[in-house]
Amino acid sequence: MKDVVIVGALRTPIGCFRGALAGHSAVELGSLVVKALIERTSVPAYAVDEVILGQVLTAGAGQNPARQSAIKGGLPNSVSAITINDVCGSGLKALHLATQAIQCGEADIVIAGGQENMSRAPHVLTDSRTGAQLGNSQLVDSLVHDGLWDAFNDYHIGVPAENLAREYGISRQLQDAYALSSQQKARAAIDAGRFKDEIVPVMTQSNGQTLVIDTDEQPRTDASAEGLARLNPSFDSLGSVTAGNASSINDGAAAVMMMSEAKARALNLPVLARIRAFASVGVDPALMGIAPVYATRRCLERVGWQLADVDLIEANEAFAAQALSVGKMLEWDERRVNVNGGAIALGHPIGASGCRILVSLVHEMVKRNARKGLATLCIGGGQGVALTIERDE
């Protein structure tokens, strides 16, 4: 099979819920990244074979949002596109599918990633087609129902985080300390300009003025142990998971340009990283946050690595309790994990996050001259994904 490489990796800044990017649809955000990948790699738009983008919240977004992003991003009508929904893992699963297409010879060049605008997710009147006859009708929040609700146990996906906290003995104090560390690392990374190379600025209008959004909006400058300790539990009055030690609701997009190594050589493009292996797993939905343990183990087994061989890890921080449980099970070196902060600080635009962590991983590996990297996420509904990449020595 063909070797698959990444030659471009970009993302938008991550916007707060109803924040600076709220006025831009997921398609607008995704198209900006698609366009920037073409411009920065100088790959002819017509040479792209397919676009694969994750998006979870598609109610009211129009037909096939990935196709919209491809065309709006400057690709010709001849380039096909598909939108996928693997919940939080969508953006990384897109890379799995792109890798398979290239390995099998069905494509040479694929743009893969994810996009989401959680701020614009509509409320849905589910009985409007048939009529309510008598009585009231209920509006369903598609953001929660389609993105954050466990369909099997009929509860918020924060409840499995509480389950993990109890199962693995993760205290409130440990969760808050983890969250504070994520905030501090993200703020230090922003101040040091660690994300500049990976971010595509977004132009937006505010009070008649054009603003350039080029920095992640979510990380807090006022995060403190005292402030985190004052927050009430969000899902269980006697629980430990709060808004402060969980990821947030956000807007953003991320994508990578992938191709066969032979095509990269033919186009004289520098290789940022090689795809080495990927894995998807399923677990009990009530313990969905532990799935990265099994996805990581399967992925490492496929490539023949030990966890100690991996130089940098990006593991999505859905919840501090979840991240700590995974770390406890895998016994990884915390100094190699989310070195610039994670989703608790940076945010979690669900359809985009899988690719966002991969983009950040690639760029940090380049900066540190690291060789081996791992990206992994848990997925609402009881799944996990992982992907390993390697850079040439």
Residue ranges and their predicted role:
Residues 46-54, 81-85, 110-115, 174-181, ...:
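Beta-strand segments within the central parallel beta-sheet cores of soluble alpha/beta enzyme folds
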Residues 84-116, 159, 165-194, 255-262, ...:
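Active-site-proximal alpha-helical scaffold in enzymes
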Residues 1-61, 65-73, 80, 160-172, ...:
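Conserved active-site "lid/cap" helical segment
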Residues 160-162, 198, 206, 276-345:
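Active-site pocket-lining segment
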Residues 24, 55-110, 152-156, 222-248, ...:
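Conserved catalytic cysteine-centered active-site region
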Residues 10-12, 22-32, 40, 174-266, ...:
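N-terminal extracellular/periplasmic Venus flytrap/periplasmic-binding protein-like
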Residues 1-24, 36, 139, 224-290, ...:
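Condensing-enzyme catalytic core mediating Claisen C-C bond formation in acyl metabolism
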Residues 109-163, 167:
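Flexible glycine-/small-residue-enriched beta->alpha junction loops
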